[in-house]
A protein has these predicted regions:
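Short alpha-helix boundary/capping elements
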Residues: 59-64, 114-119, 179-180
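Helix-hairpin-helix/helix-loop-helix acidic hairpins
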Residues: 57-102
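Catalytic DNA-binding helix-loop module of base-excision-repair DNA glycosylases/AP lyases
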Residues: 91-131
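Generic serine detector
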Residues: 11, 41, 60, 71, ...
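C-terminal accessory module of base-excision DNA glycosylases/AP lyases that mediates lesion recognition
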Residues: 1-53, 119-200
């Protein structure tokens, strides 16, 4: 079982999420906007390579070219599974990682764009802000549950005017910005993990 400890103060989260958006630059803002629009299209049944590429480009331009190795039928089938409300987090991740070019962090970004109220992006900066560094599918399931618990406690408000206007995505932005704004990246030993996953 994973343990998380929120590093920034809860009272700083909203401001950190706002700073994230201000600092990322116009190109990144456009990529994020397009990614969440593609996620909405997937949620509405448009299971296409173009939508998948748009989301992957937002998180990792260098792996987009791997996506063309997947057949259109495979992409349609896997995106349908991932977008289904009945699919578990584990099932959605396992389906998405069957695609060439999609690893766990990319799969988490795809899910966050499709269902921003349900999922968040697995990112090393956000993990640092929770005092954690490792990740696998089991870890991601617990990470989503912890972030969902924080979001449900209303420690942060949705950024209604931005892509993915949910508490989950605002929290991911805040955690990312907290990590980026630190003077140096520290390694987090296992002894740092003091807070038990409260969402259970």
């Amino acid at each position: 079982m994973a343990y998380f400890e929120l590093q920034p103060a809860e009272s700083d989260l909203q401001q950190l999420a706002e700073q994230y958006w201000e600092k990322i630059g116009e190109k990144e803002q456009q990529l994020e906007q397009a990614a969440f629009e593609a996620g909405e299209s997937i949620r509405n049944g448009e299971y296409t390579l173009a939508n998948l590429e748009t989301i992957v480009r937002w998180k990792s331009e260098r792996v987009v070219h791997y996506l063309i190795a997947n057949s259109e039928a495979q992409i349609r089938r896997i995106l349908a599974v991932a977008a289904s409300p009945e699919t578990s987090t584990r099932g959605a991740i396992n389906a998405l990682t069957e695609l060439r070019g999609v690893d766990l962090p990319i799969a988490s970004a795809i899910l966050a764009c499709i269902e921003p109220e349900r999922y968040t992006v697995l990112d090393f900066r956000a993990l640092e802000a929770l005092g954690h560094a490792r990740h696998d599918v089991d870890f991601y399931v617990e990470y989503v549950a912890f972030c969902k618990h924080l979001a449900d406690c209303r420690v942060i408000e949705p950024q209604q005017e931005l892509p993915g206007p949910t508490r989950m995505h605002a929290l991911e932005r805040a955690l990312w910005e907290w990590s980026r704004s630190r003077p140096e990246l520290d390694e987090f030993p296992e002894s740092v993990f003091a807070a038990h996953l409260a969402a259970r």
